[in-house]
Amino acid sequence: MDITLANFQLKAIADLTAAMKKPNRDIILKSCTGSGKTIILTHFMDEYFKSNHKKVFIWLTPGKGNLEEQSKEKMDRYIHGSQTKLLSDIMTSGFEENDACFINWEKLTKKGNNALKDSERTNFIEHIRNALDDGLTFKIIVDESHQNDTIKADDIIELFHSDKIIRCSATPKNYKNAILIDIPEEDVIAEGLIKKLLIINENFEQHISVDDQITYLLDKAIVKQRELHSEYLNRKADINPLIIVQIPNKSDALLDRVEEYFESKGIT
């Protein structure tokens, strides 16, 4: 998939590449939602592999939602011939040069998961040791780093003996002696990736009582989406506006309700 990178994305890749040559272990990539963080990082890894040998990237993701699978799929799509792996692939074949490995760190610490326990097959820690013995070195990317700042996550990171950790977040915490790469939101807006204007609850009735707030808001969203779609068609533009529903962390019940709503409308 050919992608034309925005100027700020190209600069971020150049800044990451330069930061990897400096002695600082921690690199903070601060990027707002909509800046194309995954595009930046996957292209950065691809460029880094081309000029650095015997390297493996470990991309750690938090929690539920299969973020590691989504990120892997994006790299497969963005970077032709990329060498990506999930945890299951690592447990089968270990680490190899130029691997980009996408791992949900909580799966390694979850009770009942034997990935970090002795077993008949070579376990996860032994795969790391074998890679290090073979002369491979690991570079770490911590996605949504503000959610990964836990003792258990740090324990996983330390297993790789990495001299470089890239921590990505829209709201990063402070790290001593870290290199900060900050993508200005105005640069993202200028490139048209996100909008400068946000209209909240346009033409909503005021001071009304509703039986089901979730259904009410989603109904409104669908009506607005159809209005916009119709207007685009009138202008002979084949654009189908997207409805984005932001759900708080650990709100599985709310997520289920939203999914059931869209299924009832034939939207899946």
Tell where the protein language model's regions lie, with residue ranges.
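Walker A/P-loop
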Residues: P23-H43
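Conserved RecA-like ASCE ATPase "motif II neighborhood" in helicase/translocase motors
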Residues: A100-I156
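Conserved motor-coupling elements within RecA-like helicase/translocase cores
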Residues: I90-C101
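Post-DEXD/H (motif II) to motif III coupling segment of the RecA-like Helicase ATP-binding lobe
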Residues: Q147-L197
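Conserved pre-motif I regulatory segment
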Residues: M1-K30
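Conserved interdomain linker/interface between the two RecA-like ATPase lobes of SF2 helicase motors
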Residues: I179-G266
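Pre-Walker A (Motif I) flank of P-loop NTPase domains
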Residues: K22-I28, K55-V56, I239-I243
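Conserved Walker A/P-loop ATP-binding site and its immediately adjacent core
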Residues: T38-H43, F49, H53-I79, E106, ...
